[in-house]
Amino acid sequence: MVRSKAQSWLTKSYDAETRAQVQALLDNEDPTELIESFYKDLEFGTGGLRGIMGVGSNRMNIYTVGAATQGLSNYLKKEFADLDQIKVVIGHDCRKFAEISADIFSANGIKVYLFEDLRPTPEMSYTIRKLGCQSGIILTASHNPKEYNGYKAYWDDGAQMIAPHDKNTIAEVNKIRNASEIKFKGNKELIEIIGKEIDEQYINDLTKISLSPESIARHHDMKIVYTPIHGTGVTVIPPTLKAFGFTNIIHVPEQDVVSGDFPTVVSPNPEEPAALALAVEKAKETDAELVLASDPDADR
């Protein structure tokens, strides 16, 4: 079963590089990787997709992500059939597949607002509501190791999908059985790049909900060490702290470098002490009072 499933990925519906990688798995005397890659389909669950990157039906790649996006497109077109133009937002951290997803949405006649660069998940959620979109996705594996990628789907309220939309979307995704059913050829006229203007609105709206502006004013110069751990937080969190009135933000330069390889940590999870080692060291060097860290998509 696994071999026949893998052989179906050798057809012209799949690109040459993918076919070559699948053939290499088939030719390998050790079948472990072949089995892991094809023994099941990567499941689109209530939280979207998450898995190891690579070729195969049980891996994150342009075809499994493509099927998820095509299925979501099909459901949006059913659910919002009365709208002249369905709109979605696409955000991403330092992982892949945002542009592929934009092409698929637009090929289905859906207007896409694509962030020009990596942005935090909370900002993507905000943008769904700010621009009056019907859905949004973010390509991120959050704090999982570099081998992983993920795909989270959101509804028009800016929250992750709940019933009945999650189950209905899953049903549509499961109907996609072959790469030939995925519309990859995008419509560039329906893809709009967004960035700084949304950042400014987002940060401005955040400052309006400060719980204690007076306390910030009194302690504006406290030393705060911040690290994004190579993720999206670097784009928004330092300017947000500045907008709130904090004047002494200390960076961890090695971890300001955006990279899906997360070169300074084993796992980019800020809940693990090892991920904070460089930030704590910087705090000791500078006599800082607070260490802040965010995970790669800055939702924790």
Regions found by a protein language model. Name each.
Residues 4-101, 192-220:
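An N-terminal, well-structured beta->alpha segment
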Residues 14, 49-51, 56-58, 95, ...:
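Short, glycine-/Ser/Thr-/acidic-enriched flexible segments
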Residues 17, 33-37, 42, 149-278, ...:
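Gly/Ser/Thr-enriched, mixed-charge loops and adjacent short helices
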Residues 65, 98, 102, 166, ...:
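Short, highly selective alpha-helical patches that border small-molecule cofactor pockets
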Residues 68-72, 124-128, 237, 241, ...:
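Buried hydrophobic packing segments
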Residues 89-148, 247-300:
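N-terminal small/polar loop signature for handling phosphorylated ligands or for N-terminal nucleophile
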